[in-house]
């Protein structure tokens, strides 16, 4: 399988040299890093090229890296049922940059892009209906950003006296705790149970 993925990585890099920044196989998964401005054409290539045929969009999400210049990392996962292969596509995105929508190529991206907009605040140019999906329309902020307070800004609850839902500022008995961006898992070796027996 690794040889097939290496061949696929070479094929993608050769066919789309203007889009591909890097292509590598790590732990049996192919990850291709691309320039965000060409993502729509790149995923169209992945779908239509006879050597790829990635016809299924499995997932679309983002990762927040507050310390990086390109704060957000967009991540798309595709599946080729014809080739029995998966590919991960990544693109760095500055905080104030817009990401081109891929809804025209993969209609399934519609709600994924709405979710990423709602949770991270990333705007998608060319999206037909970019509005909040999971939070209330009056919600302030984007909950999956690492600078979003873990307590939120407002509390939503049902008031028995008023017989309706009310919004109130969050009041806590303890002080706000600052989130530590360093992860204890960074640099960890991914060893699965049973791997130690192979050596």
Swiss-Prot record:
GO MF, one example: NADH:ubiquinone reductase (non-electrogenic) activity
Ranges that cross the membrane: none
Keyword Translocase: yes
Main location: membrane
UniProt KW Zinc keyword: no
Pfam families noted in UniProt: Complex1_30kDa
EC number(s) reported in the record: 7.1.1.-
One of the record's GO cellular component terms: plasma membrane
Annotated signal sequence range: none
PANTHER family: NADH DEHYDROGENASE [UBIQUINONE] IRON-SULFUR PROTEIN 3, MITOCHONDRIAL, NADH DEHYDROGENASE UBIQUINONE IRON-SULFUR PROTEIN 3
Family: Belongs to the complex I 30 kDa subunit family.
Subunit structure: NDH-1 is composed of 14 different subunits. Subunits NuoB, C, D, E, F, and G constitute the peripheral sector of the complex.
Cited function: NDH-1 shuttles electrons from NADH, via FMN and iron-sulfur (Fe-S) centers, to quinones in the respiratory chain. The immediate electron acceptor for the enzyme in this species is believed to be ubiquinone. Couples the redox reaction to proton translocation (for every two electrons transferred, four hydrogen ions are translocated across the cytoplasmic membrane), and thus conserves the redox energy in a proton gradient.
Protein name: NADH-quinone oxidoreductase subunit C
Organism of this sequence: Rhodobacter capsulatus
Source taxonomy: Bacteria, Pseudomonadati, Pseudomonadota, Alphaproteobacteria, Rhodobacterales
């Amino acid at each position: 399988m690794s040889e097939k993925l290496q061949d696929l990585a070479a094929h993608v890099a050769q066919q789309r040299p203007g889009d591909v920044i890097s292509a590598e196989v790590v732990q049996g998964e192919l990850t291709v890093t691309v320039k965000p401005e060409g993502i729509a054409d790149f995923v169209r290539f992945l779908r239509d090229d006879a050597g790829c045929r990635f016809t299924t969009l499995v997932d679309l999400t983002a990762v927040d890296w507050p310390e990086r210049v390109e704060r957000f990392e967009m991540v798309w996962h595709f599946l080729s049922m014809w080739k029995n292969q998966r590919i991960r596509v990544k693109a760095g995105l500055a905080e104030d940059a817009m990401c081109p929508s891929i809804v025209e190529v993969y209609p399934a991206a519609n709600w994924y892009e709405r979710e990423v907009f709602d949770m991270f605040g990333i705007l998608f140019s060319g999206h037909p209906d970019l509005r909040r999906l999971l939070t209330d329309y009056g919600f302030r902020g984007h909950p999956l950003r690492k600078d979003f307070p873990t307590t939120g800004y407002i509390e939503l609850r049902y008031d028995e006296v008023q017989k309706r839902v009310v919004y109130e500022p969050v009041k806590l008995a303890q002080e706000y705790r600052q989130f530590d961006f360093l992860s204890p898992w960074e640099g960890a070796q991914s060893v699965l149970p049973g791997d130690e027996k192979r050596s």
